[in-house]
């Protein structure tokens, strides 16, 4: 009940602030100055972060894990359809379904080592196949336990950060040897595949010795060390303040014209994917879900209909008095239905627009707060399965939470809330557009 009153209070404060800002030119001028500051001070460094070779490689390399996660999620969803007749029918086959779930979720770190090694090698201009192989070797070496047995538990979500670190170190060493020309060269007539294998021989041996020496003679559990280093970050991203900071940064970057989701994916995706894999495994074994902010939380429960919940803005445009907005709404609606909102962000526009900056940033914060609290209080499941981010509102949360009908109801409520919050700003924009249309007609 306290959380409910908190959300209501925040919403009232939001509308009061909106009313004050929209009625005063001074407030609008301050927003314009703030936008100029963002463009001059924040945009350049954040662009560099988004283009960092290592972060780009992590983002692109993790794509290799998605087929396994999505395929395993299909089995997870099918095996937990909340229909009594179906549950009775599928019960004898649940162990078989568990094999598919464990066999897909259980190797995401191994796939990440392969994918990141490949992508980083491409970014650095060295042979990607060799880079992927060396990264995988390093990750497997550090996955042996003190009893000299391979611990395949590290191949699951728990070893994801280890896979990332070992891949980056391995490819960096590989790149150093290649660029410094410390390699075994073969005659020009030798096939490329054979030549590349000999080129990677010396760096491969150094990588093997390095990780073997750390893991075996020194008895350092690299996976445990890395987990302890990243534990504060993992803890923070599963808290309400942590997810609010992330949500704020994504929206703020979009307002500045930077793809916020893509810029932060290299940092956030390993965390959210690890959360999702852990939730999926817990759900399959009928255990409590450990993480509220797993992959799907932001895309399906916060940014309904695209970042900023802009599908509601599109609906407002469809019924606008302005012909310009009606036409834009017709063009943007099909994409917005499937979470694609670039036509709105750049067409309305939202980018570098002081008027729409407030709702675009604040609405996701309110929706994130509501979603997190509902999950935290046990009133709605957290995401347990990976569904495509293009899944429409209501349907996407329903499937991602393992057919929790409460998630679908909350998604519908979110659409109403977002629409109500966009409405006053849209009416101001509509008034200005109608004046422009009248002037052009005259």
Residue ranges of each PLM-predicted region?
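Transmembrane alpha-helical segments and their short flanking loops
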Residues: 31-49, 280-289, 314, 331, ...
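Cytosolic juxtamembrane amphipathic/interface segments immediately preceding
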Residues: 39-61, 94, 187-195, 343-345
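Early transmembrane hairpin of solute transport permeases
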Residues: 47-181, 351
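Alpha-helical membrane segments and immediately flanking helix-loop junctions
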Residues: 53, 108-120, 133-138, 285-355, ...
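Hydrophobic core segments of alpha-helical transmembrane domains in multi-pass membrane transport
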Residues: 65-80, 111-119, 135-145, 164-175, ...
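Short juxtamembrane and helix-loop transition motifs at transmembrane-helix boundaries
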Residues: 87-99, 171, 223-230, 289-295, ...
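Membrane-interface helix-loop-helix junctions at boundaries between adjacent transmembrane segments
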Residues: 128, 144-241
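Generic multipass alpha-helical transmembrane bundles of integral membrane proteins
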Residues: 205-320
């Amino acid at each position: 009940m306290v959380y409910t009153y908190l959300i209501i209070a925040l919403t009232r404060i939001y509308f009061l602030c909106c009313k004050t800002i929209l009625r005063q030119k001074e407030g609008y001028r301050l927003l314009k100055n703030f936008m100029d500051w963002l463009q001059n001070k924040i945009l350049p460094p954040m662009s560099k972060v988004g283009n960092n070779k290592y972060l780009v490689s992590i983002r692109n390399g993790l794509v290799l894990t998605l087929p396994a996660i999505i395929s395993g999620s299909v089995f997870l969803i099918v095996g937990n359809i909340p229909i009594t007749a179906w549950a009775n029918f599928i019960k004898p086959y649940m162990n078989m379904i568990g094999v598919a779930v464990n066999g897909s979720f259980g190797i995401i770190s191994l796939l990440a080592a392969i994918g990141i090694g490949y992508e980083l090698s491409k970014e650095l201009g060295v042979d990607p196949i060799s880079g992927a192989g060396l990264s995988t070797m390093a990750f497997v070496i550090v996955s042996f336990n003190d009893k000299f047995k391979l611990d395949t538990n590290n191949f699951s979500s728990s070893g994801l950060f280890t896979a990332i670190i070992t891949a980056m170190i391995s490819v960096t060493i590989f790149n150093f040897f290649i660029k410094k020309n410390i390699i075994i060269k073969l005659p020009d007539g030798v096939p490329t595949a054979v030549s590349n294998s000999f080129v990677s021989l010396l760096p491969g041996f150094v990588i093997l010795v390095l990780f073997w020496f750390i893991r075996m003679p020194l008895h350092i559990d690299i996976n445990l060390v890395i987990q302890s280093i990243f534990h504060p970050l993992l803890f923070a991203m599963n808290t309400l303040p942590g997810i609010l900071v992330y949500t704020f940064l994504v929206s703020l970057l979009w307002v500045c014209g930077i793809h916020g989701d893509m810029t932060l994916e290299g940092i956030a995706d390993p965390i959210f994917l690890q959360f999702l894999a852990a939730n999926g495994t817990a759900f399959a074994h009928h255990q409590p879900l450990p993480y509220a902010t797993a992959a799907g939380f932001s895309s399906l429960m916060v940014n309904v209909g695209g970042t900023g919940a802009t599908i509601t803005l599109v609906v407002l445009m469809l019924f606008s008095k302005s012909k310009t907005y009606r036409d834009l709404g017709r063009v943007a609606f099909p994409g917005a239905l499937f979470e694609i909102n670039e036509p709105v962000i750049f067409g309305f526009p939202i980018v570098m627009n002081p008027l729409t900056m407030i709702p675009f940033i604040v609405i996701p914060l309110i929706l994130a707060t509501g979603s997190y609290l509902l999950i935290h209080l046990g009133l709605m499941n957290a995401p347990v399965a990976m569904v495509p981010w293009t899944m429409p509102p209501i349907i996407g949360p329903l499937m991602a939470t393992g057919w929790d009908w409460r998630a679908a109801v909350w998604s519908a409520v979110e659409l109403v809330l977002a629409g109500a919050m966009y409405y006053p700003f849209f009416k101001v924009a509509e008034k200005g557009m109608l004046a422009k249309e009248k002037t052009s007609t005259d």
